[in-house]
């Protein structure tokens, strides 16, 4: 049973998460505009950068929830802009891996340096134990959100 306090706490958390998401989106859109990209292209770059294993167009499609045609257009834009390169797997030439180009990674790191500094400044006010709880929460909410699908209309 949900209490008024629980609902207020959830609302406060939702507002804070939306505000953080809005600030990150503002930076993402700025970077996209500066680079002549779409915001989705920047999401693709982040997915390629954060992947635990080499990213393929198919995995990128699943991650972004786009059609294969939309992913092809996105990858084409990123390659033309010099952000990524396609590399054929040596064992199976049909498999294509997407790699972030080093110079483009430097440009992104430079652009997003204020975000990194802000995160570091925010972290400085917390103990390691507190940060561990925050990291656990963020991992849990990301996992829950990944399982959410848009309702069918």
Ranges and model annotations:
Residues 76-132:
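Charged, amphipathic alpha-helical coiled-coil/dimerization segments
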Residues 12, 16-19, 103, 114, ...:
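Charged, amphipathic alpha-helical oligomerization/scaffolding segments
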Residues 1-5, 128-153:
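C-terminal regulatory/oligomerization modules of transcriptional regulators
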Residues 21-24, 52, 142-146:
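A structural signal for well-ordered alpha-helices, especially hydrophobic packing surfaces
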